[in-house]
Each structure stands twice: as C-alpha cells, then as structure tokens.
C-alpha cells in the first residue's frame, strides 16, 4: 500500500518523461495496485502501453481513467487517438459522441472527427478494392 500516491505519481511521471518507460510502468502499476481506479495513473499507463506497442491493452486503462473522471478532455483525446491508431472506427466514433455529451466539443474534437471519417473512408475503400 502506498503512503503517498501523489508523490508516487509524480515519480512515475518523471520517469516517463525521462524516457525510463519500464520504471515508469512499474511505478504506475504500483499506484494502480493501491488504487485501481486512479484516473491519472490509468491514463498515463494506457499511454505507456500504446508507446510500447500495445495500444489495444492501453485502451482498457484509458477507459478506466474516463470512467473515473470524464471531465478531463485529455483522457478522451487519448482514447480516441488510440482507437484510431488500432483502426477501431466504431469505438472511436462512440467515444467521440460520449466526449461531446459531457461537453468536449472544441477544435481538437473536430479534428478527431475528421480523422475518424478519414479512417472510415479508407477502410471502406480497402474493403471494396
């Protein structure tokens, strides 16, 4: 059990930013063992999974971050970007709609919508080719 989750998160983020990804991952997991729904640890670990080539695994952590705190626009941006990365058009569209429902509807989300549409169009073209 962690005595100071904030200090542990700060340490994990420092390792992450320094490029020490394995240490950062271990620190995020330590936080998540103590508090499985910690939104920032889930978000950052989800991003780390994606960076390490496991974006599909990262999605589950990004979802937990959003479920815990849907008001953070960055969480929505991260999951939509990751879903686009793994070419999951349907879930990216669903996430975008949910983000809009909770009030996230600025220019970044318009660009994400355009990226989803571009991916949908390219998938349709490749399926008909």
Whereabouts are the PLM-identified features?
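TPR/TPR-like (Sel1-like) alpha-helical repeat modules
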Residues: 81-108, 114
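TPR alpha-solenoid repeat register
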Residues: 41, 75, 108-109
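Structural marker of alpha-solenoid helical repeat scaffolds
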Residues: 34, 68, 101-102
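Structural signature of tandem alpha-helical TPR/SEL1-like repeats
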Residues: 2-6, 11-30, 51-64, 86-98, ...
